[in-house]
A protein has these predicted regions:
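A short beta-strand segment in extracellular, disulfide-stabilized domains
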Residues: 462-464
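Glycan-processing catalytic domains of CAZymes
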Residues: 84-459, 468-541
């Protein structure tokens, strides 16, 4: 990307297979110093001072039409549809505006999508979570006949377990994911088009149907994956895009153009992409807005500018080097293009032997802050559910709703222009369950090493507090008790990781009112390497 840390390129493969080797990253730029994360934001976001409470209310349904942010929306409230799994009362430190407030006016022009990766839906076989495909084959190092044993198993986390369902359970589960994303304030998904046929293609079609059924205003941006789609024929890709692009859920601009945002667009030439776009128009009657997502924006922006409506980049996954996003947005806007900013939480890939140091929630907060401060037009959360990269924002077994809940806070500022007022104390605790230098004792032979350009490894527990007023925060890490004074608003406190569990509590008047425990214990001796940060929030059970 345009900064110190190289991008996090990815390989793609069908469900159950290890990803293909990832392409080499471009040379890193000069390293940048990490942001200060152990101090409060001076007069910063979340204090409620000078920030009016945004939005309210919901109304009638909108007619199908262009995606939020368009000019031909039609009358009515885009927040209508199946309310599904709404937000738990009191889950967030602030009151999240409803879809009506987040999808109209200026807020409706700032769009937030999450990258949906079809190999990892809520369930792969509709079985009980303790014995389903995830448990037997992806989390188990011996799963799939030992094909993942070399790197300790394909995954380290999984979607929050769901109960087996009667009938069309795959469709029902996809609808549940749409409801979850909608309840967090998201405008839609970017759909990774991995293959032209097979289970991933079938699931892509089902997602388009599920999105429209739950909420006609929830849109799906098509993202042909040029690391895995096995075709050099522009006509084949044009046909594949058209087949999904005709669905009502497909993301279109207000003028009716279908948004197409290929992943690693630079894998094909500008001339090749011009043929694809021409065929979509002449063969299928589809006008397009081309928003290529690059692994290397610097090297490709000028060449692609004549055919592009906007640009995006996959981005890096560490909190250092993110200041380059400022220049990327400026360059895109200078070329008259919109910019879709990648926002990430972490990245750890056992099957590729690489990870980035996310610094607890530092990467999430840094990437969101750049999207806000630098004037990005759209945001892509990278990713919703790619568990093989450990980059998931979606509710998961080891993180619960923590990362999605935190994103809702920054999303509100991004879309409304105002920091939401903190109305209830909320604590977030994050830590690894092992030390960064731990050497696994099991048969794992491929271990993850730090990606070049990443921040240095650290062994820390972070207590991130959102407080309505100053308070004492009492902590316990591996039996070591401590306390610190936290100001109103947001405060990040770092503590050394110790073997055992971690917990925190807000104390006022000698009484603990808000408490959180990260139940996953850290250990110095581990059988399988796992360098993801686990997280918990006091806002949810």
């Amino acid at each position: 990307p345009g900064g110190a840390a190289p991008p996090a390129p990815r390989g793609r493969a069908a469900r159950g297979a290890a990803h293909a080797p990832r392409p080499p990253p471009p040379p890193p730029r000069a390293p940048a110093s990490a942001p200060v994360i152990g101090t409060p934001w001076a007069a910063g976001p979340g204090t409620g001072t000078g920030s009016p409470s945004p939005g309210a209310g919901e109304g009638a349904p909108t007619a199908p039409g262009p995606s939020p942010g368009g000019t031909d929306r039609g009358a009515g409230d885009p927040g209508a549809g199946d309310s599904g799994a709404g937000r738990a009362p009191g889950a967030l430190p602030f009151d999240l505006p409803g879809p009506a407030a987040l999808r109209t006016g200026e807020a409706g022009r700032k769009l937030v999508f999450a990258h949906y990766f079809t190999p990892y839906p809520l369930s792969l076989d509709n079985a009980s979570a303790d014995a389903d495909y995830y448990a037997r084959n992806y989390l188990n190092p011996a799963g799939e006949n030992g094909k993942h044993e070399r790197y300790g198993g394909l995954l380290r986390d999984r979607p929050l377990p769901v109960s087996p369902k009667p009938g069309d359970w795959e469709r029902a589960n996809l609808e549940q994911e749409v409801r979850t994303a909608r309840a967090a304030g998201l405008d839609g998904f970017t759909l990774d088009m991995l293959s032209l046929s097979g289970p991933n293609r079938d699931r892509a079609q089902l997602l388009m149907e599920a999105a429209h059924a739950v909420d006609p205003a929830f849109k799906v941006m098509l993202m042909p994956d040029m690391t895995s789609l096995n075709t050099d024929d522009p006509g084949v890709l044009a046909d594949a895009v058209a087949a999904l692009g005709k669905a009502p859920a497909a993301h279109r601009l207000g003028d009716g153009r279908l948004v197409v945002s290929p992943f690693k667009a630079e894998a094909k030439s500008v001339a090749w992409w011009t043929q694809v776009l021409d065929l979509l128009r002449t063969r299928h009657g589809i006008r397009t807005a081309f928003v290529p997502t690059f692994l290397d924006f610097d090297a490709n922006s000028a060449r692609f500018a004549p055919i592009s409506h906007g640009f995006s980049e996959w981005g890096s996954r560490s909190y250092v080097g993110q200041e380059s996003a400022t220049r990327d947005v400026q360059r895109a806007h200078g070329l008259g293009k919109i910019w879709m900013q990648p926002v990430s939480v972490q990245d750890a890939r056992p099957n590729q032997g690489v990870y980035d140091e996310a610094g607890n929630t530092a990467t999430l907060r840094s990437t969101w802050t750049h999207a806000i401060d630098d004037g990005a037009d759209w945001v892509q959360l990278t990713t919703w559910n790619d568990y093989s990269e450990g980059s998931q924002f979606a509710p998961s077994q080891h993180n619960g709703y923590t990362y999605l809940d935190l994103s809702s806070y920054y999303l509100t500022k991004f879309k409304t222009g105002s920091w939401p007022k903190i109305v209830r104390d909320t604590l977030y605790v994050s830590a690894r369950t092992q030390f960064a230098s731990a050497d696994p004792t099991g048969p794992q032979s491929l271990v993850m090493s730090l990606r070049k350009g990443s921040a240095a490894p650290r062994d820390t527990v972070e207590v991130l507090s959102f407080l309505t007023a100053p308070a004492t925060v009492r902590t316990e890490v591996g039996g070591a008790r401590d306390a610190h004074e936290a100001p109103a608003g947001i405060h990040s406190e770092l503590l050394p990781l110790r073997p055992g569990t971690s917990s925190a509590a807000v104390v006022r008047g000698g009484k603990a009112a808000t408490e959180v425990e990260l139940p996953y214990a850290a250990d110095r001796t581990v059988r399988v390497q796992d360098l993801q940060y686990y997280a918990a929030t006091s806002g949810r059970d």
